[in-house]
Swiss-Prot record:
Record protein name field: Adenosylcobalamin/alpha-ribazole phosphatase
Pathway it works in: Nucleoside biosynthesis; alpha-ribazole biosynthesis; alpha-ribazole from 5,6-dimethylbenzimidazole: step 2/2
GO terms (BP aspect): cobalamin biosynthetic process
Family according to the record: Belongs to the phosphoglycerate mutase family.
Keyword Hydrolase: yes
């Protein structure tokens, strides 16, 4: 099985530097262009199904990438970005004085501290691992397109490669790029990370 990883295009919150876990934030014109470029780069990729986050920025990206295809799509909450709740659509500069104690604790120990009323890293990790455990349900597929978010995709790569969850920072998944992981008999290999090349059949 090959997993094709695509991060949603640039959003207004990305440009403003805001935390945007589940909060709605539309693609910018640049983000729309990134998704349309991926449509061209991946035109010949033989996707059997697409697994997508519930969030509109990911779904919009998926629609643009797959324009003209009738690829079956599954919307999965496990692929949603980490949920910041009270910190949604806020800048870290504001949190340093508006929610100083919680934000300082999170900066000091991000693996165990929890954003105010939000989803902590441990819960987020368990959610992404639930998604990994569900991949077996798609064993009839050779090529799965996964459209999601930076945090999810970085953590997905780390855990599939049997690395600790905290290793996600080693894998920055860029917007406007595609990546692939091959899984054979339960062993995952990162084949491509952040390609901007046209995919051609091997």
């Amino acid at each position: 099985m090959r997993l094709w990883l695509v991060r949603h295009g640039e959003t207004e919150a990305n440009v403003a530097g805001l935390y945007s876990g589940h909060a709605p934030t539309p693609l910018t014109e640049k983000g729309i262009g990134q998704a349309k470029t991926l449509h061209t780069l991946l035109r010949h990729a033989p996707f059997d199904r697409v697994l997508c986050s519930e969030l509109e920025r990911a779904r919009h990206t998926a629609r643009l990438v797959l324009e003209g295809r009738d690829t079956p799509q599954h919307i999965l909450p496990e692929l949603n970005e980490m949920y910041f709740v009270d910190w949604e659509m806020r800048h870290h500069r504001d949190l340093t004085h508006e929610d100083a104690e919680s934000y300082a604790a999170w900066c000091t120990d991000w693996q165990n501290a929890v954003p105010t009323n939000g989803e902590g890293f441990q819960a987020f990790t368990r959610r992404v691992e639930r998604f990994i455990s569900r991949l077996g349900a798609f064993s009839d597929c050779q090529n799965l397109l996964i459209v999601s978010h930076q945090g999810v995709l970085s953590l997905l790569i780390a855990r599939l490669l049997a690395m600790p969850a905290a290793s996600l920072w080693h894998f920055r998944v860029e917007q406007g790029c595609w990546s692939t992981i091959d899984i054979c008999e339960g062993f995952a290999t990162l084949k491509v990370l952040n390609s901007r090349a046209v995919w051609r059949p091997e």
